[in-house]
Amino acid sequence: MKQGKLIRRAVSAALAGCMMFTLSVPALAESTDALMQLSTAAKSAVSVLGEKNGTLKIGNNSFDTETNINEQELGGGTISYDAETHTLTLNGVNIEDSSGDWVIDFNDTDTLLNLVLMGENLLKGKGGIRAHDLKISGTGSLQITATNYEGIAGIGQSGDNLTIGSDVDITAMNGCAIAFNGSVRIEQDATVKAKCLYGGIDCYDLTIDSATEVNLESTGEQCNAIYVRGDNDGTVAGTANIKNSKLVLKSDYPA
């Protein structure tokens, strides 16, 4: 299968350059049905239509992305938002909300959302976080449980981007852990763990640089722990660069 060969070549080339990695067998499975992994990712593109650009939803609360949110209590912790730098700070929150599709939804296609973590933070809902361009940093940690959709997702447009520089743990019962139609970067000693039905990471361009550990488990049949593609159809290989990082992958079939 041409698609499978392209994907295997790209991933194999990336893994060959790793300074340190550990593979759990079976790992990096070849998917014979790429649409399975893209089905819930498409939810992002469809549901964003008709929504007002420039809104930040946190649980059942809705805010304007150009208005500051002074520190306020939420979910047993506090949240705050700096509209000038578009920085959302979570400090020890435990937010469980299924009133919408996403616990945190940053609907601004022109702006990077800086998510800063302090303390231990927990999010649980249909989907975890959706944003077109997202950077996660801070000394805290984030645990996401998504019952219906992705743990962290873009909006389904080309150019979606995610950077993770903090500890993140994702459980996605019926979707991908991370799905972006663009780049995903894990860095700065971050530990990222995920257990999901579909792809652990599904993106066009993957970089893992100096991460403490990236541990991904995909439980679905014919699904990948890492699925790097160059287009929506999965017929073009994407790019993966991994170095100075420990990588542990488990999926349905061996590579």
Name these PLM-found stretches.
Residues 6-13, 20, 28-255:
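A composition-driven surface/loop motif
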